[in-house]
């Protein structure tokens, strides 16, 4: 029975992951502003991970800028900035690696203390780079007030969400009219390797 129950729980968690990715994908294709979509994604991540804080930073002129958050600090959106050499967030962007700390995050030598953010005292920290076209364009952080052992599911989810946000940012740079009028077939075929274009059907 314990094994059966464990399998049920794993299946349920997998289904929750799929629903999360589906919700994010649907949000990405709706007619919503980019800030609204990013805010919606942050809310979905909070719901899945049951974290106390989720912050999304995007890269701007060599600095990471806070662009979305589930916690009420509207005055800090667009104003909190980190250099790539600063803090755990900067480390994740610089190293292009997932980072998980289960307790006493504030004692890590890489930690940057802001002084006016509640997250300064949070215990657990999970962070993943936002990747677009194989380049880091941001970082997404999940934090818990209390010590928290991050699961493999949570790490996988945050990594995938980082990739989804990266795809969203690439598409968001295109004007709607340009997207509608684009010759996608020609673009795909012209982007294919020469050998692929030259070979015919088997």
Question: Where are each of the predicted segments found?
Answer:
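A short, aliphatic-rich beta-strand micro-motif
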Residues: 123-131
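GAF sensory/regulatory domain recognition
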Residues: 43, 53-80, 84, 105-107
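Short beta-strand-to-loop transition segments that serve as allosteric relay/switch motifs
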Residues: 72, 139-148
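Signal-transmission linkers at sensory-effector interfaces
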Residues: 1-30, 35, 137, 168-198
């Amino acid at each position: 029975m314990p094994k059966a129950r464990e399998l049920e729980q794993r299946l349920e968690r997998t289904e929750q992951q799929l629903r999360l990715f589906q919700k994010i994908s649907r949000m990405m294709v709706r007619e919503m502003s980019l800030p609204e979509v990013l805010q919606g994604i942050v809310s979905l991540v909070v719901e899945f991970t049951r974290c106390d804080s989720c912050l999304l930073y995007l890269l701007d002129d060599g600095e990471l800028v806070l662009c979305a958050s589930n916690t009420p600090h509207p005055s800090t959106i667009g104003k909190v900035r980190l250099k790539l050499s600063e803090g755990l967030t900067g480390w994740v962007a610089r190293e292009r690696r997932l980072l998980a700390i289960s307790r006493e995050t504030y004692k890590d030598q890489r930690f940057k203390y802001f002084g006016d953010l509640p997250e300064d005292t949070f215990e657990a920290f999970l962070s993943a780079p936002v990747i677009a076209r194989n380049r880091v364009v941001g970082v997404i952080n999940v934090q818990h007030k209390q010590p928290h052992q991050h699961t493999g599911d949570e790490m996988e989810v945050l990594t995938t969400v980082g990739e989804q946000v990266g795809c969203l940012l690439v598409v968001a740079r295109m004007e709607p009219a340009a997207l509608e009028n684009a010759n996608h077939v020609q673009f795909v075929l012209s982007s294919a390797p020469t050998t692929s274009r030259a070979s015919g059907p088997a």
